[in-house]
Amino acid sequence: MSITKDQILEALAAMSVMEVVELIEAMEEKFGVSAAAAVVSGGADAGAAAEEKTEFDVVMTSHGDNKVAVIKALRGATGLGLKEAKGMAESAPVAVKEGISKEEAEALKKELEEAGAQVEIK
């Protein structure tokens, strides 16, 4: 039995964010690769690329001491359900939002930090 690319894409589209994160982690473990390593290619022009960066990723490194407040902030910022937001908070470090503007990233970072999370903008 063979699964087509279209079937895989349809299955991915039906998954929640947390299910996709878990799938990526399972793929990294099974194939011995890291999805983050592919993003970090730059070489000698990395400094110039950083100056021109227009899209940013907000990464929560820890939920801190007030996990409930962080889960509420995650739900508000991402539109996730309670279970998915709780799973995201507990699986830190995790990308909360990717490919957003600098202003949006800074606002999200401030919101999550006020709730008690430790956050980085990459």
From Swiss-Prot:
- UniProt keyword list: Ribonucleoprotein, Ribosomal protein
Transmembrane stretches in the record are none
Q: Name one GO molecular function term.
A: structural constituent of ribosome
Gene Ontology cellular component terms for the protein in this record: cytosolic large ribosomal subunit
BP GO terms, sorted: translation
> Which CDD domains does its entry note?
Ribosomal_L7_L12
Q: Which Pfam families match?
A: Ribosomal_L12, Ribosomal_L12_N
State the family it belongs to. Answer: Belongs to the bacterial ribosomal protein bL12 family.
Please describe what this protein does.
Forms part of the ribosomal stalk which helps the ribosome interact with GTP-bound translation factors. Is thus essential for accurate translation.
Q: How does it assemble?
A: Homodimer. Part of the ribosomal stalk of the 50S ribosomal subunit. Forms a multimeric L10(L12)X complex, where L10 forms an elongated spine to which 2 to 4 L12 dimers bind in a sequential fashion. Binds GTP-bound translation factors.
In Swiss-Prot or TrEMBL terms, this protein is called Large ribosomal subunit protein bL12
In its UniProt entry, the species of origin is given as Shewanella loihica (strain ATCC BAA-1088 / PV-4)
Report the gene name: rplL
